[in-house]
Regions:
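ATP-dependent phospho-/nucleotidyl transfer catalytic cores
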Residues: 114-195, 204-207, 301
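Short acidic/His/Gly/Ser-rich catalytic and metal-binding motifs that mark active-site loops
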Residues: 50-55, 115-117, 223
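Short, glycine/acidic-rich hinge or "gate" loops at secondary-structure transitions
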Residues: 94-98, 145-156, 264-271
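Conserved NTP-binding catalytic cores of kinases and kinase-like/nucleotidyltransferase enzymes
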Residues: 1-101, 206-207
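Active-site activation/catalytic loop segments of kinase-like enzymes and analogous catalytic loops
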Residues: 63, 76, 222-263, 284-303
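Active-site acidic catalytic loop and adjacent metal/ATP-binding pocket
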Residues: 27-36, 42, 181-227
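Helix-rich C-terminal or lid/interface subdomains of diverse kinases
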Residues: 129, 255-321
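Conserved short submotifs of the Hanks-type protein kinase catalytic core
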Residues: 103-114
């Protein structure tokens, strides 16, 4: 791909080099760092493939349409929401969007140029706290946001967009309760916007690890904040440490949430928000477990901790039925 015309449209004179960061999921393009003049930018090059190449074989028309929708949502998000984000939940600003029939270029700031120079595969407590702070401020500042033209239900595993995986689910108890779990999350008080894919790999950090910024907003939309917290913990805490770390993760998140609500939503009662959200952590994880067990039954994210949490969620739902 020749990125010279794009950088010229942005006012740069010289294209020095490009660096492939990663190919997009399922062969839908690439993420590239472009070095131009004395700086660098990030370009998300979305190219719709003629044949779909899903790593786990879910090559369906529905899967393809979901990805197309996700890129449309992401473009809308960058154009209309990112410029309004609070500094404590920052994301790269869009620089230019070029849409053609089967391709799209999303040029955005390079977080490296803004001081977010690190990504990590293993998070220390400082990294964990930085991500939880980002999520808390993101959730607090978007409580009751209508999420115009975003996903009606955020997250890439939402049940309405995953009928194939639900059909493949071999856990009869979880399958029976799947829609009740979803309805419980949809009915949660203080609905907000969720990132939708808040895994550790989608956060970049300052060199000291104290601040995080997030990327990859294909599945941003309305929902219960605990969905993001559960997905994040599933990606950032080893299964054998989850039981021990759960209380710390939740306390850290809610500590940041208190500060964020007090600062940005003075008309809301923090204690009411926490009272409504904290019990939904296990429900949100059970919702994710429903997807993973249908999608990839031998996945490492299915383990004793997640099974116990799912059981806890189903028991809670049955008590309230």
């Amino acid at each position: 791909m020749d990125y010279l015309p794009l950088i010229q449209q942005l006012g740069y004179k010289e294209l020095h080099s490009t660096q492939l960061i990663q190919s997009l999921w399922g062969g839908y393009g690439e993420l590239v760092r472009v070095f131009a003049d004395k700086t660098s930018i990030i370009v998300k090059h979305i190219a719709l493939p003629e044949t779909q190449n899903h790593p786990r074989g879910w090559n369906t028309t529905l899967s393809h349409q979901r990805k197309i929708n996700s890129y449309q949502v992401e473009l809308h998000w960058y154009q209309n929401f990112v410029p309004l984000l609070h500094k404590n939940c920052s994301a790269p600003l869009p620089l230019k969007i070029v849409e053609q029939e089967h391709t799209c270029l999303l040029a955005m700031q390079d977080l490296h140029q803004l001081g977010y120079v690190d990504t990590v595969k293993e998070a220390n407590p400082m990294h964990l706290s930085a991500c939880l702070k980002w999520l808390a401020w993101f959730h607090a500042t978007h409580i009751q946001n209508p999420g115009d033209k975003l996903w009606e239900s955020g997250t890439y595993w939402h049940i309405e967009t995953r009928p194939d995986e639900l059909e493949a689910l071999l856990d009869p108890v979880l399958k029976k309760h799947a829609k009740q779990i979803d309805l419980k999350l949809k009915g949660a008080p203080f609905q907000t916007l969720v990132h939708g894919d808040a895994k550790l790999a989608n956060f970049c950090f300052t060199a000291d690890g104290k601040q995080a910024a997030a990327v990859d907003f294909q599945y941003v939309g309305k929902g219960c904040a605990m969905k993001d917290v559960a997905l994040f913990m599933s990606s950032a805490v080893a299964p054998q440490q989850c039981t021990e770390k759960e209380q710390w993760i939740l306390d850290t998140y809610f500590g940041h949430l208190r500060e964020a609500i007090d600062s940005t939503q003075p008309k809301l009662s923090y204690s009411e928000v926490e009272k409504a959200w904290r019990p939904l952590f296990c429900i949100a994880w059970a919702d994710f477990q429903r997807f993973v067990k249908g999608w990839s039954p031998s996945h490492w994210k299915i383990n004793d901790y997640t099974e116990a949490l799912t059981k806890q969620a189903i028991e809670a739902i049955n008590k309230q039925a």
